[in-house]
C-alpha cells in the first residue's frame, strides 16, 4: 500500500509544470529543491530516515530525471496539527538570511490535518488554518506560484490495526473525508495540485 501511494505522488510530481516546461525546452533543472511540510505521515513515524516519502520521492526523481543535485528538506513532527506547523513555518518565512535552506524551493508538498481530527480539534480551526498554510507554502516556493505546491490528502488510519482498535472506525473515516473534501475543494478553487492517497490507504487491511 505504501508503495502504491508513493507511486501516485511520484507520477503527480513528474507531471508538474516545472518538469513539463523543462521537457519542452529539452533541458532539465540542474539543481532542484523540495520542501515537505506535514506531520508523522511526512516524517515517516517508525521508519528509517531514508524510508519516508520525501526521501523515497527524491530517490525516484533522481532515477527518472537528469538532475545534478536534488535536495530535500522536511518540516514535520509526529503529532503536529495545523497550528503547530504554522508556528514552525512562520520563523522560516521571517528569516531573510541567504543561508535559509527552507526557502526558494522548486517544489513544496503539504500533508497536514490528521492530528486535528485525531485530537478532536474544532473543524473550524482547519477551515481557517489550512488556507493559511497553503499560502505560506506557496511563499516558500521559488516561483511564488501555486503550480509548484502539491497538497496530499490525509490517509485514512481507520483502515489500520490501530484505527480498528478505536471505538468507531467508521466515524474516523467520515471525519477524514470531511477534512479531505475541504482541502480538495480549496485546491480546486485556487489552481493547486491535489493528490488523493486516501482511497489507496483504505486498502490497508487487505494489502
Predicted regions and their residues:
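Sec-dependent signal peptide recognition
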Residues: 2-8
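Serine-esterase "nucleophile elbow" of acetyl-processing enzymes
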Residues: 17-78, 98-102
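Charged, often glycine-rich, active-site loop that binds/positions anionic groups
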Residues: 78-96
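A generic structural signal for short coil/turn motifs at secondary-structure boundaries
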Residues: 43-46, 83, 117-121
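Residue-level detector of flexible, active-site-proximal loop/helix-junction positions
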Residues: 41, 79-81, 156, 201
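Alpha-helical cap/lid subdomain in secreted, periplasmic
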Residues: 90-207
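C-terminal motif of bacterial Sec signal peptides marking the signal peptidase cleavage site
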Residues: 12-15
Amino acid at each position: 500500500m505504501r508503495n502504491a501511494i508513493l507511486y501516485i505522488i511520484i507520477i503527480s510530481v513528474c507531471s508538474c509544470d516545472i518538469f513539463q516546461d523543462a521537457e519542452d525546452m529539452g533541458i532539465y533543472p540542474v539543481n532542484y529543491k523540495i520542501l515537505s511540510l506535514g506531520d508523522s505521515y511526512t516524517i515517516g513515524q517508525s521508519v528509517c530516515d531514508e524510508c519516508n516519502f520525501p526521501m523515497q520521492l527524491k530517490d525516484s526523481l533522481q532515477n527518472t530525471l537528469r538532475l545534478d543535485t536534488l535536495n530535500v528538506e522536511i518540516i514535520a513532527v509526529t503529532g503536529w496539527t495545523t497550528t503547530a506547523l504554522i508556528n514552525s513555518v512562520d520563523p522560516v518565512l521571517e528569516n531573510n538570511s541567504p543561508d535559509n535552506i527552507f526557502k526558494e524551493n522548486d517544489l513544496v508538498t503539504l500533508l497536514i490535518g490528521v492530528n486535528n481530527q485525531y485530537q478532536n480539534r474544532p473543524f473550524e480551526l482547519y477551515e481557517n488554518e489550512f488556507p493559511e498554510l497553503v499560502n505560506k507554502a506557496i511563499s516558500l516556493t521559488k516561483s511564488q506560484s501555486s503550480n509548484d505546491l502539491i497538497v496530499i490528502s490525509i490517509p485514512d488510519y481507520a483502515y489500520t490495526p490501530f484505527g480498528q482498535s478505536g471505538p468507531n472506525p467508521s466515524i474516523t473515516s467520515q471525519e477524514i473525508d470531511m477534512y479531505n473534501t475541504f482541502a480538495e475543494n480549496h485546491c480546486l478553487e485556487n489552481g493547486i495540485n491535489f493528490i488523493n492517497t486516501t482511497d489507496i490507504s483504505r486498502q490497508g487491511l487487505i494489502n
